């Protein structure tokens, strides 16, 4: 399944229509203005339109759990690891609203960054996340939306840059809440590379997936963000590039940080391992690359989609 993070400007259903136009079979959206703590309630008419359109597109079925591959990304304001009680409470309240909105819209997956332990330490941050989820799942008992902890570049006090930390978070949340089916993972290829999980070659990509499977369980991966990286491996730089034009899949010009696309090079990169892996076939693969046109004047989403599909055969 392939999709992109698309705008809901005008109406949420516009993202579905744009996704269909671009040739995708899933999509990622914000369900509200992600830069604001408060949001208007979902309009009932818009909800009906959204649900009808997802059924019309058959985007409400398939995917890793048979519920389709539509994804929502939670607000970047949320920090469930914060030691600041006011920020933590606001984050829990906003995350609660995000879960409610996904449940109303029948969006199966809600991706969010775990948080940052500014002013404390990693053990404290992990405990705050566990406590947050205990409250979140208490407030949303019986909901079906799966919250996906996203791997990060691991810069500074940001949590999620190591597989062992992702695994520990999920294990603690699942044990505390007795809701293992509601907590899963999202990986981002750019974040992986920048965090130090080098994806420069196909063999390295296979090794990264094998390590993730061993530590976290590939069955718990529900969403994959597919982005090339403007930063080198272990750079801790969270900047996305078009597929085959960054430090993962492209022949990057020294010092310039700009890539020159080569299909031959792309086929030797970690992207080839990810796209051809049978365990990832039904997982929504979401582009979060810059929304610009390619040199031919066409949306770069089309170019990136075409490049990924060239790799989506076993053992390319």
Report each predicted region and the residues it spans:
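C-terminal helical cap(s) of enzyme catalytic domains, especially alpha/beta-barrels
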Residues: 294-314
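Gly/Pro-rich active-site loop or hairpin
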Residues: 159-163, 167, 193-282, 299
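Conserved, mostly hydrophobic/aromatic
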Residues: 19, 73, 91, 102, ...
């Amino acid at each position: 399944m392939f999709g992109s993070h698309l705008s809901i400007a005008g109406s949420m259903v516009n993202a579905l229509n744009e996704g269909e136009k671009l040739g995708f079979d899933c999509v990622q959206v914000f369900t509200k203005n992600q830069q604001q703590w408060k949001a208007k309630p979902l309009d009932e008419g818009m909800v009906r339109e959204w649900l009808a359109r997802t059924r019309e597109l058959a985007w409400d079925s398939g995917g890793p759990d048979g519920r389709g591959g539509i994804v929502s990304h939670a607000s970047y304001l949320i920090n469930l690891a914060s030691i600041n009680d006011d920020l933590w409470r606001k984050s829990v309240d906003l995350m609660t609203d995000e879960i409610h909105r996904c449940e109303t819209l029948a969006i199966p997956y809600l991706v969010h960054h775990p948080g940052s332990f500014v002013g404390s330490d990693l053990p404290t941050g992990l405990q705050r996340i566990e406590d947050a989820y205990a409250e979140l799942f208490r407030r949303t008992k019986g909901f079906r939306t799966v919250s996906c902890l996203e791997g990060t570049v691991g810069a500074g006090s940001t949590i999620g840059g190591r597989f062992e930390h992702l695994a520990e978070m999920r294990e603690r949340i699942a044990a505390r809440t007795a809701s293992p089916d509601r907590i899963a993972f999202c990986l981002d290829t750019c974040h992986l590379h920048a965090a130090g999980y080098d994806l420069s070659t196909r063999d390295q990509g296979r090794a990264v997936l094998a390590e993730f499977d061993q530590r976290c369980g590939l069955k718990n991966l529900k969403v994959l963000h597919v982005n090339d990286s403007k930063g080198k491996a272990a750079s801790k730089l969270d900047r996305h590039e078009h597929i085959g034009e960054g430090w993962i899949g492209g022949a990057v010009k020294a010092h310039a940080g700009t890539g020159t696309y080569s299909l031959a090079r792309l086929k030797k990169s970690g992207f080839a391992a990810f796209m051809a892996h049978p365990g990832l076939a039904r997982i929504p693969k979401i582009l979060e690359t810059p929304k610009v046109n390619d040199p031919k004047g066409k949306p770069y989403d089309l170019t990136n989609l075409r490049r990924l599909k060239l790799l989506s055969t076993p053992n390319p």
